[in-house]
Regions:
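Juxtamembrane transmembrane-helix boundary motif
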Residues: 1-18, 23-35, 39, 56-140, ...
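Short N-terminal amphipathic alpha-helix/helix-capping patch enriched in small hydrophobics
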Residues: 24-28, 44, 51
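Transmembrane alpha-helices of multi-pass small-molecule transport proteins
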Residues: 45-60
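Short hydrophobic/aromatic, small-residue-rich stretches within specific transmembrane helices
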Residues: 46-50, 171-175, 197-201
């Protein structure tokens, strides 16, 4: 019964994140931290759930011709090698919780401070900037189990490289690819997902299916962003201080 309730929480997280083009890796980690999952299971479980959720979102965005692959490729190609390197690195439990807690707090701050720029024109994306950001986000993705979209999205918007809707469409395949590579590195390093991942994955997929459609058609992003920011901030504090 507890596993089913926990799966429903994963599904709810996936739904909320999918409304803004994200998979939910940061909140998956937050939930597992609250439930005191072993640290060697948290990262691979979060990455696997990212893959499930982002696969559907990527398919839906691509089917609607919303993914700007030319803009995505420099970010993606730079991120994959560093995501693999990050996945190879296994931190001890205290250091992992410290790093992940800081990542969650940073993600919460980004979500809270992010502003929509629908009416402003996009700027050209410089190759050096795209590769630098892609490499940095990829490394953090592989190291912590965060797909990277929660950092990529606000950067794209803040730098005027993409509109919010374009950013959502770019984030899903970025998260998918980096999560696949990061999971490969984590499993090579001896980490494996929790035994109940299949149940959590079904819930995450259902949430992604609903959330992506809701986000594309109806829901304002503002309230979802602040709610998720509060969850991530609380989880980051819990990891760092308790």
């Amino acid at each position: 019964m507890a596993d089913i309730m926990f799966a429903l929480l994963f599904g709810a997280v996936s739904l909320l994140y999918a409304t803004v083009g994200q998979a939910g890796g940061t909140a998956f980690l937050a939930l597992m931290a609250f439930a005191s999952f072993p640290s060697n299971e948290m990262r691979p479980t979060a990455l696997l759930l990212n893959i499930v959720a982002a696969s559907y979102s990527t398919w839906l965005f691509n089917r609607g011709s919303l993914v700007d692959w030319a803009k995505l490729m420099p970010l993606l190609l730079a991120s994959l090698p560093t995501a693999l390197v990050g996945g190879f690195i296994v931190l001890d439990e205290r250091l992992y919780k410290t790093v992940t807690g800081l990542v969650l707090l940073l993600a919460a701050a980004i979500l809270a401070l992010r502003r929509a720029r629908d009416g402003e024109p996009d700027r050209p994306t410089p190759l050096w900037g795209a590769t630098s950001i892609g490499a940095a986000v990829g490394f953090v993705s592989g190291l912590t189990g965060v797909g990277g979209g929660v950092f990529l999205a606000p950067l794209l918007i803040a730098l005027h490289w993409a509109s919010p809707k374009q950013t959502a469409a770019l984030s899903a395949p970025f998260i998918l690819a980096n999560s696949v590579v990061g999971l490969a590195g984590a499993m090579y390093a001896g980490q494996t997902p929790t035994a109940d991942t299949w149940l959590f994955a079904l819930a995450a997929l259902a949430g992604a299916m609903i959330g992506t459609i809701v986000g594309l058609r109806w829901l304002s992003q503002t309230m979802t962003r602040y709610m998720l920011g509060a969850i991530l901030g609380a989880a980051g504090i819990q990891l760092l201080f308790f």
